[in-house]
């Protein structure tokens, strides 16, 4: 699969807002402090963006790390209807927008569409409790808009505390119309950690957004860190939302049965996007010991309307291909279950060896062999889609 290459003009836009990195060791130290905060090694502080050092660290490192993550679920959403946004105004709202990371990822992705598939204009709303974050979001998107006059952008920034103030905020945000996309990127993990009854509050936040913000034909994109705890929390939230019947899952799941990753305590389901890390990210990784050689995250695409039913032979790849002695194995998900599919190396087919986490694959000709499945003679393996790379 081709690597994702971070756009050079976006690096220039981000660099103009972040300012000169200065001493890279000091920048790396601030990135390390943010990492400890985000993974729970230090107590949560929602106001980290108020620190100039932490703001620069986030813009220089975490913004380019997180921006591409929204583009994979967007591609999954568009796969069913490539002209979904064509020639009309697209409205999107980002809940807990930070410095506009996901919105910048959205508009970057939109400009890469074929001209016939692009929206005529984009109306964005960014909600965050940090004044500093919203200032950065406005500056970044203003610079981006200046480079893409063919796709007019308009941004409205709203400062509020989502959990406490959304009953007043959501009707105001939707005053000009409901949204085609509601984005919640790296938000629910903060709600779970920061507030009492955090899991229930996170669930209610998305349910409320579906009721008050989302257009009937729209989608909610949820992106969470690819850690076991945060991914499994998202699996539990998925099951809760689907059980209540207001939302349906369009990706990555091919079914609406309870998530099979929760059948054990050790499993979780994430995406893994291969990329070429920008030089500043690679250098900070070297200085801190962080590893962003690929981008791991959990995501859901949810919508009020049900998706198309997957064929019985369609599976989602939920692991890397495991190279064992004499055979290769891979985990697949569909129909409410995970299975292990094995292929002997002496029977190896290129398509099997080339499978990657996140692929949709059509498999004709599997047979159960004890606890696992094997490809039968004459079986056919066909990759339907690959995780998008730019």
Model-assigned labels for residue ranges:
Residues 1-45:
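N-terminal auxiliary segments of SAM/dcSAM-dependent transferases
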Residues 44-82:
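Class I SAM-dependent methyltransferase Rossmann-like catalytic core
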Residues 99-117:
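Conserved SAM-binding loop of SAM-dependent methyltransferases across substrates and taxa
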Residues 135-173:
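S-adenosyl-L-methionine
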Residues 179-199:
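A short SAM/SAH-binding and catalytic strip from SAM-dependent methyltransferases
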Residues 200-217:
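A short glycine-rich, Lys/Arg-flanked "PGG" loop and its adjoining helix->strand segment in the class I
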Residues 216-224:
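Conserved beta-strand signature within the Rossmann-like core of class I S-adenosyl-L-methionine
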Residues 279-390:
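C-terminal lobe and adjacent flexible extensions of AdoMet/dcAdoMet transferase-like proteins
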């Amino acid at each position: 699969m081709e690597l994702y290459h971070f756009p050079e003009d976006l690096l220039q836009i981000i660099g103009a807002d972040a300012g000169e990195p200065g001493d890279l060791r000091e920048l790396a130290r601030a990135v390390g402090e943010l990492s400890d905060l985000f993974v729970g090694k230090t107590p949560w502080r929602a106001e980290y963006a108020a620190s100039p050092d932490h703001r620069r660290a986030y813009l220089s490192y975490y913004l380019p790390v997180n921006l591409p993550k929204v583009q994979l679920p967007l591609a999954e959403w568009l796969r069913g209807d490539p002209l979904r946004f064509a020639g009309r105004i697209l409205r999107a709202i980002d809940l807990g927008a930070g410095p506009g990371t996901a919105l910048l990822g959205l508009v970057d992705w939109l400009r890469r569409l074929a001209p016939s598939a692009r929206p005529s204009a984009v109306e964005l709303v960014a909600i965050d409790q940090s004044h500093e974050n919203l200032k950065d979001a406005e500056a970044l998107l203003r610079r981006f808009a200046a480079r893409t006059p063919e796709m007019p952008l308009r941004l409205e920034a709203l400062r509020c505390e989502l959990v406490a103030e959304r009953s007043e905020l959501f009707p105001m945000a939707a005053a000009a119309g409901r949204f085609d996309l509601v984005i919640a990127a790296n938000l629910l993990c903060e709600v779970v950690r920061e507030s009492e009854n955090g899991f229930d509050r996170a669930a209610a936040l998305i349910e409320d957004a579906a009721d008050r913000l989302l257009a009937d034909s729209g989608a909610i994109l949820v992106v969470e860190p690819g850690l076991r705890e945060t991914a499994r929390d998202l699996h539990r939230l998925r099951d809760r939302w689907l059980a209540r019947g207001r939302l349906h899952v369009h990706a990555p799941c091919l079914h609406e049965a309870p998530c099979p990753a929760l059948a054990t305590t050790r499993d979780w389901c994430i995406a893994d996007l291969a990329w070429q890390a920008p030089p500043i990210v690679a250098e900070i990784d070297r200085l801190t010991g962080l590893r962003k050689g690929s981008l791991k995250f959990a995501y859901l695409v949810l919508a009020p309307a049900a998706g198309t039913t997957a064929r019985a032979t369609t599976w989602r790849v939920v692991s890397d291909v495991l190279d064992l002695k004499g055979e290769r194995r891979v985990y697949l998900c569909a129909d409410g279950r995970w299975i292990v599919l094995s292929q002997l190396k002496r029977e190896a087919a290129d398509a099997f060896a080339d499978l990657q986490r996140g692929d949709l694959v059509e498999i004709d000709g599997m047979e159960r062999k004890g606890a696992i499945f094997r490809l039968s003679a004459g079986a056919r393996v066909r990759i339907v889609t690959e995780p998008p790379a730019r």
